[in-house]
Amino acid sequence: MEKGRWSSEDAPRASMPDELSHPKFSEWKFKLFRVRSMEKAPVQNETPVEKENQPELAMEKTSSQGSVMRLCFGGKSKENVESARGRVDLKLQEIDTHMNLLKNMCRLCGIAIQKAKGPSHEVQGVLEESSRCALRRMGCKLVTWPEVILKVFKVDVTTDMETVHPSLFCHRCWTAAIRGGGFCSFTNTRIPDWKPHTSQCNLCFPKKSSFQRVGRKRTKPLKSAHILPKRFRRDSSESSRVWRQTTENPDGKEWLKLSVQRGQWVKNITRCQRDHLSTKLIPTEVPADLIRAVTCQVCDHLLSDPVQSPCRHLFCRLCIIRYTHALGPNCPTCNQHLNPSHLIKPAKFFLATLSSLPLLCPSEECSDWVRLDSFREHCLNHYREKESQEEQTPSEQNLDGYLPVNKGGRPRQHLLSLTRRAQKHRLRDLKNQVKTFAEKEEGGDVKSVCLTLFLLALRAGNEHKQADELEAMMQGRGFGLHPAVCLAIRVNTFLSCSQYHKMYRTVKATSGRQIFQPLHTLRNAEKELLPGFHQFEWQPALKNVSTSWDVGIIDGLSGWTVSVDDVPADTISRRFRYDVALVSALKDLEEDIMEGLRERALDDSMCTSGFTVVVKESCDGMGDVSEKHGSGPAVPEKAVRFSFTIMSISIRLEGEDDGITIFQEQKPNSELSCRPLCLMFVDESDHETLTAILGPVVAERKAMMESRLIISVGGLLRSFRFFFRGTGYDEKMVREMEGLEASGSTYICTLCDSTRAEASQNMVLHSITRSHDENLERYEIWRKNPFSESADELRDRVKGVSAKPFMETQPTLDALHCDIGNATEFYKIFQDEIGEVYQKPNPSREERRRWRSTLDKQLRKKMKLKPVMRMNGNYARRLMTREAVEAVCELVPSEERREALLKLMDLYLQMKPVWRSTCPSRDCPDQLCQYSYNSQQFADLLSSMFKYRYDGKITNYLHKTLAHVPEIVERDGSIGAWASEGNESGNKLFRRFRKMNARQSKTFELEDILKHHWLYTSKYLQKFMEAHKNSVKAMQATFNPEETPEEADNSLDVPDF
């Protein structure tokens, strides 16, 4: 290859996109040169070339008025060719001179290339090997100069035009780019503002005076390849506006012929002299019509990779692409509009004729006639025969396809190139017609009419990609994601506002499209999902509750009547009003409600009343949540969360006794369905503060049970009644709310009045006797002591009630804490069996520590269970398995004890599904039927083989497991569905929201956590997250590359564990 030539793969502009008709063409607003028509004298002498073009001249007369650009490419008309000397328009020579001046200038700093010592470099080229290696060592992986220039000098050179911008940059700018490592520039390079050539061009006609200072040398004129002749001056004496020259060509240069001038101009744009074959190689015997048919209408060379325009003219693919990009999308022959995407391959017969065309071999030693399709191989054989020192091969003549090059040129004076004022003037009549049509047919919607016209025009032009984009925008879809989708992604990936905004800007800058929505649109979407947006009404109105519906996050202490003697509350609390939160949750389930009505074949318009909503309430303390940051008052570093879950929605039709369930929560123990209501920094053992905060919640709850909610669902007003079931509490919280003594009390159970001794003697036969109303009556007896009894007698009468119950709880068993409590008990049994406590009644503390260490090592070895300080849900699930007890039995010496342990675990594993299952009658009917028998067998085994441990004592949860599970399942249908597991999982979300995207202030962070947690549980957003699950995982890995340690499951406080 010759030096300086490019192959099709290595071409400097190979990365230019195929869509040369840029959609922002109208924004560029190129200023076109104004060309005035010229009257010239008739032609006296015609050259043979001009005579050959007589048919073209006749054809031109029938077409539109010729332009200067048509003159460039051989189009002749009376207005353009009338001079005896065949001179062309002077403006063409001015542009040619302007382009030659640009070739000597630096694109980046504007200085002359000769002033910067060192080689020049192609702006649109690829990196040389030395430059690429130098930048690669500094971490830059770019491969083309346009990318490096954009990165270093912040200049986009991919849209440069040859008639406006220089194509080279100097060695100084190259040095600056290399020193900056391809990322930045350490020199302050001022980028010139390159403008198209005009009559006042500063480059061609510099305004600088000839003398810079008195007494100095005259400045040297700018070097140029062409010396401009004298400027024309206009003679306005005649109305024909003839152009005359002031001197008779003083330089002695003769005017170039029109065809020669045209050829020079084309060479500057197509640059295909070395790549395309001349038509002179065709034998003279070939008819002239055939030669014209196989000749490119742009470069006058033999067709290379021929394409055909819709107007039936033939061009080289590379030449027509460069031509349209430089001078506008017009056909060089007929001046019709030409879209490069509409170019097609000619007919196969024509291509076969072109391939079989005989050509004369250009080699002097050879005079063979060679077919065009084998011409390249024939020439290669000649070059291989020459053994030259220079490695020059004929692959210079790229006879394959050619890559488009971003060459410039002044565009045709098109509608898009006009100013806004000129566009309005030109389209005034059309605008009036469209407006009249829109008012008559489309109700005055001019925008829709114009967009539809544009859409139809794109479809007619086969530009379906752009048409699809326009149609998506018209339908409101567009490229960008819906604000609700962006909100769902932000909430579920735990992004703070600043993190999301950074992602939004990065994606927008990288892709050039606004895929993600800005933060203000997300805030608008939030308002519809948060409580306080939807209107509603209560009939009758709620007692002691405001009738306003637009209530957001409020202070948790609002509604607390403060007396003079009260001290300020040592807590911070934020909550939603209970009724407002329930309304927002129902509106979030609106689609599910309507879908349930359709599935049950119920008439939507008839179902406006009789709806019943069952709500599960949960409350739990989170323990220590201390943070190092946070301004505000000193508050306890413990927190309590109160939440609710809509379990089911049913409707009772008129005349029907049974209700029809139209919505059933499929995941009642998921954190996605457990909605937060109240957050507070308070110790759950602080009865007074907890009562003060939850008191207003209890009042709102009581008022709602006596009223009906009227709300619009599915476009119709419908009435709902609410039933609340407080089941998501652990035993500690139940005792706190029902006013019972602590869990170490003699009265072991929160469901019956049994003492610990009674429960150990009779482990199975007990029934539920406690209730909220009974506890209130017993509190009054405890407070008043009407029978004047002693303390022990009074305590025995009230069965462990020692404080006023302030919230009604459902007498039930919490499945999660039952698992944790029973696993803790089994862990202690395993220790005792390893140490053979049945033979040693009073072991020392050191012995117990040794047994525990042995058990931990065995569980770590066999079950991969790491020791924990407090029993949690995950550990309990792994411990209560057949594999775990078999591993423990390896450490038990006695065969009889091993069999007893295995039987004990087998019985437990048969009973466990009954209280863990969401619907035991469906999921495990056999275990449900055998539960009473299994529990009796379990109790007998404890009383006999493990009497050393259960002689006069038993744990609280073990008593409930053996005595009360069948009764609860018979009454409620399930225990597992009403567990507190969802609230416990929500505790982990509290910590994560607090760490990731909450303001670092105790006063405001509760509001942020409450808001984000509510959005996290939105069913509406969860549907979007299902569709975008994979993108969310990728984004979460991008913004949170370091995995945060999993929060431990909330534990049951077992002091001796």
Swiss-Prot record:
It comes from Danio rerio (Zebrafish). The gene is rag1. Zn(2+) 2 binds at residues 296, 299, 316, 319. GO terms for biological process: adaptive immune response; B cell differentiation; chromatin organization; protein-DNA complex assembly; somatic diversification of immune receptors via germline recombination within a single locus; T cell differentiation in thymus; V(D)J recombination. Zn(2+) 1 binds at residues 272, 276, 299, 301. One of its GO terms (cellular component) is nucleus. InterPro entries: RAG1 (IPR024627), RAG1_imp-bd (IPR035714), RAG1_Znf (IPR019485), RAG_nonamer-bd_dom (IPR023336), Znf_C3HC4_RING-type (IPR018957), Znf_RING (IPR001841), Znf_RING/FYVE/PHD (IPR013083), Znf_RING_CS (IPR017907). Its cofactor is Mg(2+); Mn(2+). The RING-type zinc finger mediates the E3 ubiquitin-protein ligase activity. Catalytic component of the RAG complex, a multiprotein complex that mediates the DNA cleavage phase during V(D)J recombination. V(D)J recombination assembles a diverse repertoire of immunoglobulin and T-cell receptor genes in developing B and T lymphocytes through rearrangement of different V (variable), in some cases D (diversity), and J (joining) gene segments. In the RAG complex, RAG1 mediates the DNA-binding to the conserved recombination signal sequences (RSS) and catalyzes the DNA cleavage activities by introducing a double-strand break between the RSS and the adjacent coding segment. This is V(D)J recombination-activating protein 1.
